[in-house]
């Protein structure tokens, strides 16, 4: 399985606990006015990489990551949910802490098929950095071009699943 990777930061200290390998994925449905990664918006940008290639990057510096792990961010990593799930499943099989940095904008509680995908992903996610862009619904649309509803639905879903959230 491959994903579209914007970049990889080998010594991340602000994207979850400890020192982390931070993987920035391509693709984001939001158009945040203050976005510091607008070059991640398009899904076809970046470089194609496999799960094994990313884990090989982790292994190069694994001694630094022992109290940290892997964080996947973007863009919004949920654009590539199947890839992230496979990466996290492989990471968890190696005892690596997993962290997902997302707004949750792509969560759709009315879609049973999508909820099953989220169930599979959250089963191997240790921590979610939930990026709520604005709490006011109108301001959220102005800021991101997207409704707040799905973000809040994702927050409720994470709570029901007892997923740790920062």
Regions found by a protein language model. Give the residues of each.
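Conserved AdoMet/S-adenosylmethionine-binding subsite of the radical SAM
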Residues: 59-69, 78-166
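Conserved alpha-helical substructure of the radical SAM core
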Residues: 38-70
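Short acidic donor-binding/metal-coordinating loop in glycosyltransferase active sites
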Residues: 74-75
């Amino acid at each position: 399985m491959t994903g579209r990777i914007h970049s990889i930061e080998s010594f991340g200290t602000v994207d979850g606990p400890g020192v982390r390998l931070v993987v920035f994925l391509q693709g984001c449905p939001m158009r945040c006015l203050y976005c510091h990664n607008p070059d991640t918006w398009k899904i076809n940008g970046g470089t194609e990489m496999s799960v094994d290639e990313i884990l090989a990057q982790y292994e190069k510096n694994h001694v630094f990551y022992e109290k940290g792990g892997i964080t996947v961010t973007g863009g919004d990593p949920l654009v590539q949910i199947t890839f992230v799930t496979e990466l996290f499943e492989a990471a968890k099989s190696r005892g690596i802490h997993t962290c997902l940095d997302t707004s949750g904008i792509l969560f759709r509680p009315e879609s049973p098929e999508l909820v099953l995908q989220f169930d599979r992903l959250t089963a191997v996610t240790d921590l979610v950095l939930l990026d709520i862009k604005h709490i006011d619904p109108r301001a959220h649309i102005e800021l991101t071009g997207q409704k707040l509803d799905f973000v809040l639905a994702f927050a409720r879903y994470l709570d029901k699943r007892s997923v740790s959230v920062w």
